[in-house]
């Protein structure tokens, strides 16, 4: 571990936290018959509906192929509807999808917030948010190094 820079240690910590948090969220969301990815997709659809599959894929952490399969499943379960508007197919929540999200949302947000609320005060949380936002914005512009 001596060769690691503080930046690489932060990156490893973020990866481990993300994996652990996703595993725990998946377990938590089982009580609502949802996965973390499905919850995220439903929340993004509700926030931006109607939207195309391509627009949705840009907003979530699921691959294009994974989005396709997930949308098919969510449509079969009655949570979403896909409508063809001339050349564009848009996605919206159904009443059933809205109800599922409303049941899960408050509890999932409280669960996720507890990761931070339990150990960081409000000022520390704001600082962490600002730092992560700064790193995220930089990462969106970052290019791969030349070979």
From Swiss-Prot:
InterPro entries: ArsR-like_HTH, HTH_MarR-typ, WH-like_DNA-bd_sf, WH_DNA-bd_sf. Pfam families: MarR (PF01047). One of its GO terms (molecular function) is DNA binding. Residues 1-137 form the HTH marR-type domain. It comes from Bacillus cereus (strain ATCC 10987 / NRS 248). Disulfide bonds: none annotated. Keywords: DNA-binding, Transcription, Transcription regulation. It comes from the Bacteria. This is Uncharacterized HTH-type transcriptional regulator BCE_2019. Residues 53-76 bind DNA.
């Amino acid at each position: 571990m001596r060769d690691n820079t503080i930046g690489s240690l932060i990156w490893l910590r973020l990866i481990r936290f993300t994996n652990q948090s996703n595993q725990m969220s998946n377990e938590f969301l089982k009580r609502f018959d949802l996965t973390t990815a499905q919850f995220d997709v439903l929340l993004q659809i509700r926030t931006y509906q109607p939207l195309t599959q391509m627009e949705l894929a840009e907003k979530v952490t699921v691959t294009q192929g994974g989005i396709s399969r997930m949308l098919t499943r969510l449509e079969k379960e009655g949570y979403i509807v896909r409508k063809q508007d001339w050349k564009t197919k848009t996605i919206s929540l159904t009443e059933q999808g809205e109800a599922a999200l409303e049941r899960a949302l408050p509890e999932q947000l409280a669960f996720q917030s507890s990761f931070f609320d339990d150990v960081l005060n409000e000022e520390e949380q704001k600082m962490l948010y600002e730092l992560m936002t700064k790193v995220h914005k930089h990462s969106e512009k970052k290019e791969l190094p030349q070979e």
